Design a protein with these regions (language model features):
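Primarily a LysM-type cell-wall glycan-binding module
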Residues: 1-19, 40-55
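Short glycine-/small-residue-rich flexible loop motifs, especially phosphate/cofactor-binding loops
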Residues: 12, 23, 142
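Short alpha-helix capping/helix-loop boundary micro-motifs
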Residues: 22-23, 27-31
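Cell-wall polysaccharide-cleaving catalytic domain and substrate-binding groove, primarily
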Residues: 29, 52-245, 249, 254-368
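Short secondary-structure capping/turn micro-motifs that flank functional sites
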Residues: 31-33, 42
Length: 368
């Protein structure tokens, strides 16, 4: 008998319907990956006719079976281990680049955590999301940020953010804003079929309440939010599911949508104000060139909106003093390139200073 794939179905859901395992379905249909398309016919090999049945709730052991699609290769190196993860894709098996645990960082709080730059590049995926950017230079700003943060499949799971993912390193921990949960919710909303294929069949899900809840199934219980992200950080097969999702169009677009909403548009909002000599001045009247907007957006991603305004105020006041600007109206003529230079000089953290200075060489216009 055969089964025709319907919308939102996955190998996991189909296998449960017929009492088979995912591996059995893949073997009899010569499938190289878990990816399906609507209308695809699958051979259902049964010893005798069976009426399809749908269990009331998924069995956690089935999640453990599907997770075996992510093959973790470990290379002990004494005080740490090197790893790669291999997983099937429509174009054949993909193997990650090399990464390690016990990551050498003063910010490390989880020895099992890793740092992985990724392979799903901004440039090669640009056509998938260019239409989302209201201004052309938003693309270049996001590209600049990606150079400092990572690819669409990048991972950081060693620091206090618990588990961070994507080209802007969206954080999982609630204390860090849980922006990754927003990305996953958007991914599921935009393309539930792809979300199920990337996550649900592996026991990873989003409960879309007023405040979305991130969930991961384990043999004992279903974990939520910080505990769930900790499980992903400590389980490289689950980490592999995130890496694989970073190659999917809908996940890439979800990342860009949230980046635009939470960082770009908030950073350049006309409601953002600067206090100068006791007077509130719209920041859009001060830093209004491409370069000025790029600086504001990059700082918002790296330090948050409040943190960005603090360092911007100090740099703007310094440049105003150098230039003899004494009024709020005069700030409109401030040298924005000089603001970037002063802000970088004020920075004691080498990485943050270098990141800011890179803006001067990205081709952004500072012409007023």
């Amino acid at each position: 008998m055969t089964h025709t794939v319907q919308a939102k179905e996955t190998l996991f859901s189909i296998s449960k319907k017929y009492g088979l395992t995912v591996e059995q379905l893949m073997k009899v249909n010569n499938l190289l990956s878990n990816n399906l398309f609507i209308g695809q016919n699958l051979v259902i090999s049964l010893p005798s006719p069976v009426t399809p049945n749908v269990p009331a709730k998924p069995v956690v052991s089935s999640y453990l079976d599907t997770r075996k699609a992510f093959v973790v290769n470990k290379q002990p190196k004494g005080t740490f281990n090197n790893y790669t993860i291999s997983f099937p894709s429509p174009n054949g098996t993909i193997t990650t680049g090399l990464f390690r645990d016990n990551y050498p960082s003063p910010n490390r709080v989880n020895a099992k955590g890793i740092s992985y730059t990724g392979k799903s590049l901004f440039d090669t995926n640009r056509t998938l999301f260019a239409d989302l950017c209201q201004q052309n230079y938003y693309l270049e700003v996001l590209h600049h940020i990606a150079k400092n943060e990572g690819c669409f499949d990048a991972i950081n799971s060693y620091d206090k953010a618990i588990f961070s993912f994507g080209f802007i390193q969206f954080t999982g921990a609630k204390a860090s804003g849980a922006m990754l949960t927003r990305v996953l919710q958007r991914f599921k909303l935009r393309d539930e079929y792809a979300f199920n294929d990337c996550f649900t069949q592996y026991g990873i899900n989003i409960q879309s309440d007023k405040v979305p809840i991130f969930k991961v199934a384990t043999p004992a219980i279903t974990l939520e939010d910080d505990a769930a992200y900790t499980e992903v950080a400590n389980n490289l097969q689950l980490t592999g599911a995130f890496i694989a999702s970073g190659f999917r169009r809908s996940m890439i677009r979800a990342q860009v949508e949230i980046a635009l909403e939470e960082y770009v548009l908030k950073a350049v909002s006309p409601t953002v104000m600067l206090n100068f000599k006791g007077q509130s001045v719209p920041l859009n009247n001060v830093l209004k060139t491409e370069g000025g907007f790029a600086l504001r957006i990059d700082l918002c991603v790296n330090r948050g909106l409040t943190g960005s305004l603090s360092v911007l105020k100090t740099a703007i006041e310094k440049v105003a003093q150098e230039s003899g600007i004494t009024t709020a109206v005069g700030l409109a003529k401030i040298n924005e390139r000089r603001v970037v230079e002063v802000l970088a000089m004020n920075e004691t953290d080498t990485l943050k200073r270098d990141r800011t200075l890179k803006l001067l060489n990205e081709g952004f216009s500072f012409w007023k």
